Amino acid sequence: MLHMDAKKLGALRTDLERELKENILPFWMTLAPDKEHGGFAGYISHQNHVDLKANKGIVMHARILWTFSAAYLVYHDPAYLETAARAYEYITGHFTDRESGGVYWELNYRGAPVTMRKQVYALAFTIYAMTEYWHACGEKEALASAVRLFGEIEEHALDRERNGYIEALSREWEPVEDVRLSVKDANERKTMNTHLHILEAYTSLFRVHRDPRLREALDNIIRLFTERFIDRETWHLRLFFDDDWNLRSDFISFGHDIECSWLLDEAAGVLGNRELEEECGRIAVQMARVNFRGLDHEHGLIYEFFPGENRADTDRHWWPQAEAMVGYFNAVSYTHLRAHETVLDLV
């Protein structure tokens, strides 16, 4: 049961729906499509200047595909499905590596590969997006692509000796020295962030593809979080590891903490293991409670904290606020937590 005033919930729904339908979705539908070269523009400035010659990334295209597929499922607006189809066609026509499998990380503005390595984070986002597109329109090849990518992750990125998934591989699925997702990340081969999005993708795919191998993989990655990534003393996430699961980081990411709380709970529910469901429900509440320490009641959730330096990065990034909305709502379904209302008002 959700412990929040019904009138507040109704007002919140109205506000969120207005923001989504009058601002967020029209922004991407109006400014982002690259009508000259296909797909979507790789860069839009803060002043809404569209750079049609910027490189194009798979993660952005996958996120657009997922978003407009999900929007179509709720509102049944043909324009949303048309936007999703544009993303789907560009991913299949340009990002898909038909020789080696997987998807390219980055293309130039004309659609030619620039960065061809296999970033497992990107493969996970593509699975997530393809599955949602299948939900939206029943495109069988989209679901087949998601299943194929799952198989490639399991074949090439799973560490069968020590468990966990390798961060990145070459185009031909060979080891690479620099596996970083971005320049600010630690160059370590097993990261919480990539595992979190594999968890998200496998959860979505398992809803519609009840394959025993996928069930086993989803069960395994849930347990990697409960046993490896979540610190049971602090209830924060451990973020970077080497191949042998030696911890290589000591900072706190509040956005990832609250994101993990609800994604893990959702995954356990989809898997259908009662014991794991109960455990992950308790974890979700505990992680949400601890997450309040990063919540500024005037300005929202801070970004990171570095215990060794007793220093906080108090920048407000958009995505931790969005994850906090979902994560706190999820925790509220178990208990009488109230801090979620502060975040909702701030966002």
Where are these regions (language model features)?
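Low-complexity, Ser/Thr/Pro/Gly-enriched N-terminal "stalk/linker" regions
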Residues: 2-58, 78-86, 90-103, 160, ...
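Well-ordered alpha-helical segments within folded domains of soluble proteins
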Residues: 3-5, 55-73, 81, 118-135, ...
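Conserved small/polar residues in nucleotide/adenosyl-binding loops
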Residues: 335-342
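Carbohydrate-binding/catalytic loop surfaces
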Residues: 37-55, 100-122, 164-190, 234-255, ...
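Extended ligand-binding groove/face enriched in aromatic
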Residues: 78-190, 194-196
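Extended ligand-binding clefts on enzyme/binding-domain cores
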Residues: 19, 23, 150, 157-169, ...
